[in-house]
Amino acid sequence: MNAKALYKKKALRDRRKLRIKSKLLGDALRPRVSVFRSNRYFYAQAIDDVKQSTITHIDGRKMGFKNTQEDAKKLGALFAEELKKAGIERAVYDRNGYLYHGVVAAFAESLRENGIAL
């Protein structure tokens, strides 16, 4: 990809991100689960938007997981356990401008399978 195409791709993601965030709001009972995926790793965090604080997070890089669908499912199961320890059973899923496909979708499905209502 040339520089112009990369710029357009990032600009489109930023527009999606703003559109999504304007509609989502998390609180202590139903936090916002925000995900970030790089080319190599996957990260997620549960955010209380009222207090502007992170409740819990998971770091795929520190745990040795790569940015694959299988690893996203494993991370989803581990993150669901962390959320349950924090007393959270419902959340709002913030895909952070990424398309709901592949790793982002696998992580969300894994959270649902492990008892977190999104």
UniProtKB/Swiss-Prot annotation:
Q: Does the keyword Coiled coil apply?
A: no
Q: Which Pfam families match?
A: Ribosomal_L18p
**InterPro entries per UniProt:** Ribosomal_uL18_bac-type, Ribosomal_uL18_bac/euk
One annotated GO molecular function is:
structural constituent of ribosome
GO cellular component terms, A-Z: cytosolic large ribosomal subunit
Listed A to Z, the keywords are: Ribonucleoprotein, Ribosomal protein, RNA-binding, rRNA-binding
Mind listing the GO biological process terms from this record? translation
* HAMAP family linked to this entry: Ribosomal_uL18_B
Please give the NCBIfam families that the UniProt record associates with this protein. Answer: L18_bact
Q: How does it assemble?
A: Part of the 50S ribosomal subunit; part of the 5S rRNA/L5/L18/L25 subcomplex. Contacts the 5S and 23S rRNAs.
- Tell me its family: Belongs to the universal ribosomal protein uL18 family.
Q: What does this protein do?
A: This is one of the proteins that bind and probably mediate the attachment of the 5S RNA into the large ribosomal subunit, where it forms part of the central protuberance.
Q: What is this protein called?
A: Large ribosomal subunit protein uL18
- The gene name on file is rplR
